[in-house]
Amino acid sequence: AGXXXAHXXYKGPSVVKELVIXXXLGLXAG
């Protein structure tokens, strides 16, 4: 499911991609 979500984000707008990356980094840091 993670791969599919990442693929969808990759195809989406750059803004969405940035939000996804920020969320992932936040979870990793948290």
UniProtKB/Swiss-Prot annotation:
Transmembrane residue ranges: 15-30
Q: Which of UniProt's keywords are assigned here? A: Membrane, Mitochondrion, Mitochondrion inner membrane, Transmembrane, Transmembrane helix
Say which domain of life the source belongs to: Eukaryota
Where mainly found? mitochondrion
Q: Looking at the UniProt record for this protein, which Gene Ontology cellular component terms does it annotate, in alphabetical order?
A: mitochondrial inner membrane
Give compartment(s). Answer: Mitochondrion inner membrane
Give a short account of what the protein does.
This protein is one of the nuclear-coded polypeptide chains of cytochrome c oxidase, the terminal oxidase in mitochondrial electron transport.
Record's family? Belongs to the cytochrome c oxidase subunit 5C family.
Stated name of the protein: Cytochrome c oxidase subunit 5C
Look up and give the organism this protein is from: Solanum tuberosum
- The primary gene name is COX5C
